[in-house]
């Protein structure tokens, strides 16, 4: 349960200002098609972030920089869990209206989590957080959404993983974040619901119904 930046720093003694992360609404499938996409480069050294961003940018990839490495890393993990939740709801035949409510509450929950584990000033509506959350939750290219949809349709976790032949990172992320949150005790009902469905074997129908009663 260690962030990638922390792992490289602790295990290989790489200075934090030499570690950069990239995130944003940027599916590889659309990059291959040269469709306009946006990336944020996160590094504790903004100068280094700008250097990396300059090398990554081109006519169809717009780049920006941030020093919120921890927030970006956690956001990139959390959005996969929320995408599984979105997929589960889709598999259960909830419509677009509820999907919008789910993602709105996911953004609130993500912001709450980030503000506790790494309390700095950030704008959750920036594309590196909100944009990545939305594209992962809605896109047909999202492995995590597809995985969640299969769970919502009644597949077991094992059968969904076998049939997908791809890794849905959110499955593993749900367990990691659940364990991390044992220390922080943050209110994360969506993450808890996904964890209960995937690891405790609780019915998706029951867990999502509980969420519908708590959302605004």
Regions found by a protein language model. Give the residues of each.
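Catalytic, metal-anchored helix/loop core of enzyme active sites in primary metabolism
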Residues: 52-54, 60, 64-65, 78, ...
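Short beta-strand and adjoining strand-loop segment in the mid-core
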Residues: 32-50, 86-101
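Rossmann-like NAD(P)(H) cofactor-binding subdomain of soluble oxidoreductases
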Residues: 1-34, 52-54
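An active-site-proximal "capping" alpha-helix that borders the catalytic cofactor pocket
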Residues: 104-117
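Fold-independent oxyanion-binding glycine-rich loops
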Residues: 22-25, 43-45, 66-68, 86-88, ...
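Conserved Rossmann-fold dehydrogenase catalytic segment
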Residues: 25-31, 59-83, 120-130
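Active-site pocket-shaping loop/turn-to-helix segments
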Residues: 97-107, 166
């Amino acid at each position: 349960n260690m962030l990638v930046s922390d792992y490289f720093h602790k295990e290989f003694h790489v200075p934090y200002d030499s570690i950069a992360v990239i995130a944003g609404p940027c599916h590889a499938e659309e990059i291959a098609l040269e469709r306009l996409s946006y990336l944020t480069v996160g590094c504790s050294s903004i100068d280094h972030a700008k250097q990396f961003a300059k090398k990554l940018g081109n006519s169809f990839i717009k780049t920006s920089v941030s020093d919120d490495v921890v927030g970006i890393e956690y956001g990139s993990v959390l959005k996969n869990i929320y995408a599984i939740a979105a997929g589960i709801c889709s598999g259960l035949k909830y419509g677009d209206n509820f999907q919008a409510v789910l993602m709105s509450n996911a953004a609130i929950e993500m912001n709450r989590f980030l503000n506790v584990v790494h309390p700095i000033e950030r704008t959750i509506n920036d594309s590196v957080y909100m944009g990545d959350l939305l594209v992962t939750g809605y896109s047909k290219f999202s492995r995590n959404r597809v995985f969640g949809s299969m769970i919502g349709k009644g597949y077991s976790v094992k059968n969904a993983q076998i049939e997908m032949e791809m890794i849905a990172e959110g499955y593993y992320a749900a367990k990691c974040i659940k364990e991390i949150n044992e220390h922080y005790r943050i209110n994360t009902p969506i993450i808890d619901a996904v964890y209960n469905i995937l690891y405790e074997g609780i019915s998706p129908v029951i867990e999502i119904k509980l969420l519908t009663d708590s959302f605004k």
